[in-house]
Amino acid sequence: TGAVTIPATALVTGVLTTTAAAVFNGGFTSNGTAATFASSTSDSPNIIFKNTTNDANAPIMDFITDKGAAGADNDSLGLIRFTGDNDAQEQTTFARVLATVADASNGAEGGRIQLQVATHDGEMQTGLVINDGSAEDEIDVNIGNGTASVTTVAGNLAVVTDLDVDGTTNLDVVDIDGAV
């Protein structure tokens, strides 16, 4: 019982178990390939990043890919998977967030983030892509996957430049020049 201070490196070759909350004052590094947080309690486990500094900055979660060689277009930078049981109690990935390098060219670096969901056969398809554009400070966004995809806008759609429609357009109420 009581506090234990280890003035140097502590080597644990088996499982380290604590019966209370473990507090690390300082950095914590794990050289393992996976860390698992498991709980049989509803709405748990939780991972909390809490910044208690009185300033305008938020906590940061970094996904860093440093492969020891030059980066290349389409390098994967980070993946968040959302997996659960289907009705046969099989573990199925239902959604993913994937970040990749769109352009690795020095001085023209550009990124890409994709939101993906499982479609009717469980196959992962990209529904939203936010991608580096073809000019500085330009971002392109693609919504949907395939010509049968439906994009619904519940409120107003504001187009601040040209509207380019490739296909059939059905307009129920048209007021372009002030007349209906």
Description of each model-found segment:
Residues 89-96:
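Amphipathic hydrophobic-ligand
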Residues 110:
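Short glycine/proline-centered loop/turn elements that form peptide/ligand docking sites
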Residues 73-81:
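Short, hydrophobic/aromatic-rich segments at coil-to-beta transitions
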Residues 1-73, 88, 101-102, 107, ...:
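Intrinsic low-complexity, repeat-rich intrinsically disordered segments enriched
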